[in-house]
């Protein structure tokens, strides 16, 4: 959380070396304020929006341009999430931002912040690069993560308006009221208001306590003085971490206003040159001359006033003022370890042997396969391979373990064992608890052989020096030895290892106090000092801080500047400084505070002795912020991290770790912190950040197998949290872990760890198989196969079977046979019955895939025999099921049912487990299919419903999906049952929602809408409309405009059926507009026609169909030259106008339809068009034209009648012509001829009723006056344009 913003950046605001604001300046500001106008505008609140735009761009690293395909994929994914943004909300919650809206078309998010902490954390994640990686988690699916080249080549660049972000930050600062600033110029006190105003130097750090518009009350963090300061002279600290730290760890530094360090911008070590002569002011300081060489003990850090040096000429050791030496003459720290030594860096993240073993065990559990002992079921992967399985077994060793625990917990040795003092204050408790760790008193036989071993049960005479000689001799050693380590360690183990048999701590204190007196009397300097130190630590245990201070001060006086035991000197100075800080006694030892800070920060591998050292660490960090030294700030953050980890206060580590990560910049320094952050994020349940912090490190940072395996372990755990899979499910491998697993594999290859290499290859192959990518699986299994041969026969056999199985799943049967057949030959002379059975079974699957049914059956039978020999019921069941499936594919339903029923019986004998129940689901599906083929519908339904029950029992989504599909087909096509069909479609929809398959969900809602519509009740139409509208929303989210357009149309059709006419046009128009926007003319044409059909096929407002047909569909059809579509539309228009009695319009449309029918060359279409045209002419009383068109239709019929339907058509048309010519054209003789032809057609049909009707009609004509008016039987002459062969219309 130690972030800064992009534009404000890491501004180091140095004070000019030795330059103060002149006292001669006029009162008020010591420099012209016109240059500060922009800063004041930024600082004072302005009218601005609190929303921030976060834009993203998916780029290719190699091409250095936008990856258009991935950018579009991200946009589509975002579009799908725009209306259901729970997943996006959850992501930005992890990133400490509040999502306002998703703007997919603009490739951006709108976010906001309510607190300083939120904007601080978000800016940190933004600068660390975690935001862009988290967006990858959101945008891309497994196809991206499994493509290693694409992942390595892709980066998401995110951008924000940094000025706007800074303004939001400043606004929130002003809301809080209490914040920290730097003086942008020197400020002097006005002469007439002396004492009221604060005198400031440029860049001095100020704590603003309360403010007005022009002035504010403030306190200097350098001097501690309070007073008024002009607001225009202040600039808020731009780094949120600084604001947080100074607010939560208040205090002043007591530094001089002049900066005491210049020169190098790096931490120095090695040897340096003195710039001036220096005479010691205190005994612990080093005297030297200008130009003298000084060896740096530890580091020299810019920003600290002191460091520890050793004179090359005299060999003396002491404190050296930083200002007196040339920093550039030191050897700078390398970029690889800019702020700490290699040993210190390794202490931050080293997983250790225990963690490596635990992670390796987990990976082995994940890679475990039973392929060497359990037969494989044909086509079983269709049910198994689904990532969103809701219930699965968990590998051993993963139930209780947490990914970051061991290496952190290792640093908490003894930190939680506190012995409470009942009457101590909370503040004192915090200071004391680390030093007052409770300890047990071991018996002598429990102890190793210590250098000092004192029995305090015997009575000791204070006057007898002999009783105290052992401890005095032990402690009076000049300088440091390993025996003294227990004096300074965190657990104070010296007490428990060197003394025993005392009932109360007071006895121990009395013994040590007497020993101190003897040491003092005997002038035993080192024993005296160490005893004072021990008594001081014991005084802290008893909350006697003042007494402890006296002991520590006495010890320092006794040492009189001796540095032979640096651990003792550091412990004394730091403990005493902590007490000064806690008791607010800075004035008592200002120099000691600075020297204690130097001992703490400059000595590498410092071992913390007490919890109260945190006060000194924060003092040094505050000093680094005040003087603007990023190096000192980074070193202090590192020390804070180590101490807090030692105390087990992991929550408090995060801000310091994030700040250190921002300051580190270069690997491997940043890698150590990044690894630690990964574990901390995991502990805080921030899975996106935990994975991002690992992935951010990249493939180049996979150094060391233990670390790489631990990272893979952590990512695998957190990837399931990102996907929302319950923590109990570890049998699936998320594709999100693929890059990390590959890095781990590369690290193992460098170290030639073949066992772990093979394990990782098996896990990667499993991942690729889960995502239906057999080629990727084969790649890694080929490596595992080679490694298996090197490891042993068992591993080689297992790897061979896995590879063959992958080839079978990838339909590479020949390659599978190349492995399996030699493998079978090698097993013939062995007694490995089960293994031979496994190979026979896989051979059967291979032969079945090739269509070699006979050989497949023989292999399955041999596998069955081997299973029976071993008494393995499960393998027998699988063999029977495979035989049943083989015979089912060969259309031998009876045999198939027999085998499958035996398989079901065998499965019923097994103890219930998820694996066997899922196999049984597949067998029941086959048995149901066989029953359908045998027309045993009741049995089939029973099989399907039993299979679904097993899927529900184990919450196994894939099996439920397969069974539900079969049930939907069964109740829609095999044994129609609308209610049952709807029920199972609803369940299918629920499964799609659990699988987060939006496309499937949309299609199912569309199908459900149709099913409800078919019921045609008021309630079902309402439900249908709800389904269609929900599918519409999904299709719009997915950007599938064609389906969205059809959904708009479907909703409009339903509103028409529900007589909600005011909404019909709205939905139909939106459907057409959506289709037009898709730039697919064929879709627009289809929807124009279907929109017209809504009215054409209805009973209300049928005239509205004309505008969709004539104005919409016809122009599009002509533009696309879709003759048949245009013809169909004109036919509909003709029929519509006839029904509406608009015969003039009908004639226009029918004529056009007839012309188009001629152009199509389809005689059937031409016949229909001319028949409809004849009907229009008849309706318009144009009888001669009607007769001609009817005759044209007859000419289009085949010369020989081929079916009763054709004969019926002839009979009807000739009857129509007969009535027309007799009644309308008054031509009895032509009418007679037409009726005779109709009679002939009726005779061919064998329809006696029709024949009698026609004969009666002929009799009436012959007896009519019209017949007798023309006795010669001559017909009248009439035009025959069309029937005579003319093409003109």
Curated annotation (Swiss-Prot):
Return the GO cellular component terms, semicolon-separated.
cytoplasmic vesicle; plasma membrane; recycling endosome
In which residue ranges is the amino acid composition biased (Low complexity)?
A: 414-424
Q: Which key words tag this protein in UniProt?
A: Repeat, SH3 domain, TPR repeat
Q: TPR repeats at which positions?
A: 529-562, 758-791, 837-870, 1002-1038, 1085-1119, 1120-1153, 1167-1200, 1211-1245
Cross-referenced PROSITE patterns? SH3 (PS50002)
| Residue span of region Disordered | 393-442
PANTHER family associated with the record: SH3 DOMAIN AND TETRATRICOPEPTIDE REPEAT-CONTAINING PROTEIN 2, SH3 DOMAIN AND TETRATRICOPEPTIDE REPEATS CONTAINING PROTEIN
State the protein's name.
SH3 domain and tetratricopeptide repeat-containing protein 2
Organism field: Mus musculus
